[in-house]
């Protein structure tokens, strides 16, 4: 459960992300594909090369979804319901992949926002991404 302090930290960090959410999403996807090659199996139709339009496009979707989640931090299930349906019923993404992408997102944010990525912000973002992952996998059960 996200505390009021966690919510404040997440919103402040995401304000720093600003218009870079799509770029950071794409970078996190590239990190995930390089660090966890089995995740590539969900994207057989993508050119997974650095900077490819498909990875950039999906990175923008990831960034937009997270921006939406931050905006609706008090109602993540409502905000992410359609995305949860898509990943559970149509795409059938293995739930572990959300944890892998979350880790890569944290690394990406730490790399781009080093002075803002304090231990408290790190913990809050980790809890937030875990909450998002939980919502996205909630319909698998």
UniProtKB/Swiss-Prot annotation:
Residue(s) carrying Phosphotyrosine: 24
Modified residues (Phosphothreonine): 8, 108, 134, 137
Modified residues (Phosphoserine): 3, 35, 102, 124, 131, 138
Subunit composition and interactions: Heterotetramer of two alpha chains and two beta chains.
Superkingdom, taxonomy of origin: Eukaryota
Modified residues (N6-succinyllysine): 7, 11, 16, 40
Positions with a binding annotation for heme b: 87
Keyword Heme in annotation: yes
Family: Belongs to the globin family.
Coiled coil, from the record: none
Domain Globin per the UniProt entry, residue ranges: 1-141
Keywords for the protein's UniProt record, in alphabetical order: Acetylation, Heme, Iron, Metal-binding, Oxygen transport, Phosphoprotein, Transport
Role summary: Involved in oxygen transport from the lung to the various peripheral tissues.
CDD domains: Hb-alpha-like (cd08927)
Gene for this chain: HBA
A Pfam family annotated for this UniProt entry: Globin
GO MF terms, alphabetically ordered: haptoglobin binding; heme binding; iron ion binding; organic acid binding; oxygen binding; oxygen carrier activity; peroxidase activity
Gene3D superfamilies according to UniProt: Globins
Keyword Transcription recorded: no
GO biological process: hydrogen peroxide catabolic process
Modified positions (N6-acetyllysine) in chain numbering: 16
Name this polypeptide is given: Hemoglobin subunit alpha
């Amino acid at each position: 459960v996200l505390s009021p302090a966690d919510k404040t930290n997440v919103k402040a960090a995401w304000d720093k992300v600003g218009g870079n959410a799509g770029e950071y999403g794409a970078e996190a996807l590239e990190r995930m594909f390089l660090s966890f090659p089995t995740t590539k199996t969900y994207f057989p139709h993508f050119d997974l090369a650095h900077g490819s339009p498909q990875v950039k496009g999906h990175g923008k979707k990831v960034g937009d979804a997270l921006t939406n989640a931050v905006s609706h931090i008090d109602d993540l299930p409502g905000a992410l319901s359609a995305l949860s349906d898509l990943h559970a019923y149509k795409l059938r993404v293995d739930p572990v992949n959300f944890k892998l992408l979350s880790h890569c997102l944290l690394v990406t944010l730490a790399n781009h926002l080093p002075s803002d990525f304090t231990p408290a912000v790190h913990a809050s973002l980790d809890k937030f991404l875990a909450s998002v992952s939980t919502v996205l996998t909630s319909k698998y059960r």
